[in-house]
């Protein structure tokens, strides 16, 4: 089976759904952000602070290409889709899943989360604007799932149905 790439904006449920799907399909799950932190030996927020977003995006592209393209679920950072080369790579090497969640719901979830570098010191309008700028890229995915106000079970049922189509 080709890899399954789970994309979506921060807070949409990528990590949670990736873990749940991993159990259902008996496949390993790899988180690109976690792998970058391990390789760079620092947290993402520190990479952003010390090296900037462009350096992080380069690490992200390198990491994406280093991962297996079969029998694995890959949960991605929210901005991985900003680079056309990344979108193309994922579409050519697996099934891309876009987890959509209303940006106002996400903002409420993340308001106090200090581990989210692009959410820090941003107002809701700027957050929603960044979300909307990325939306067309996310929508290039093979499968779209709206996670807004849904349980993990509801999301998983819908995702399994769409994967098996």
Curated annotation (Swiss-Prot):
GO terms for cellular component: cytosol. It comes from the Bacteria. Keywords: Amino-acid biosynthesis, Aromatic amino acid biosynthesis, ATP-binding, Cytoplasm, Kinase, Magnesium, Metal-binding, Nucleotide-binding, Transferase. Its main location: cytoplasm. Gene3D superfamilies: P-loop containing nucleotide triphosphate hydrolases. Its EC number is 2.7.1.71. Belongs to the shikimate kinase family. Monomer. This is Shikimate kinase. It comes from Bacillus cereus (strain AH187). The gene is aroK.
């Amino acid at each position: 089976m080709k890899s399954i790439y789970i994309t979506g904006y921060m807070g949409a449920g990528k990590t949670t759904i990736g873990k749940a799907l991993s159990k259902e399909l008996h496949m390993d799950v790899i988180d690109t952000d976690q792998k970058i932190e391990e390789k760079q030996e620092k947290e993402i927020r520190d990479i952003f602070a010390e090296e900037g977003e462009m350096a992080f995006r380069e690490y992200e592209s390198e990491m994406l290409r280093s991962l297996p393209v079969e029998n694995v679920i890959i949960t991605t950072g929210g901005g991985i889709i900003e680079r056309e080369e990344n979108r193309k790579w994922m579409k050519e090497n697996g099934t891309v899943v876009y987890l959509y969640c209303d940006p106002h719901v996400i903002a409420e979830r993340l308001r106090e989360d200090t581990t989210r570098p692009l959410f820090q010191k941003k107002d809701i309008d700027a957050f929603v604007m960044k979300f909307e700028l990325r939306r067309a890229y996310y929508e290039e995915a093979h499968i779209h799932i709206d996670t807004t106000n849904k349980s993990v079970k509801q999301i998983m049922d819908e995702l399994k149905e769409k994967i098996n189509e």
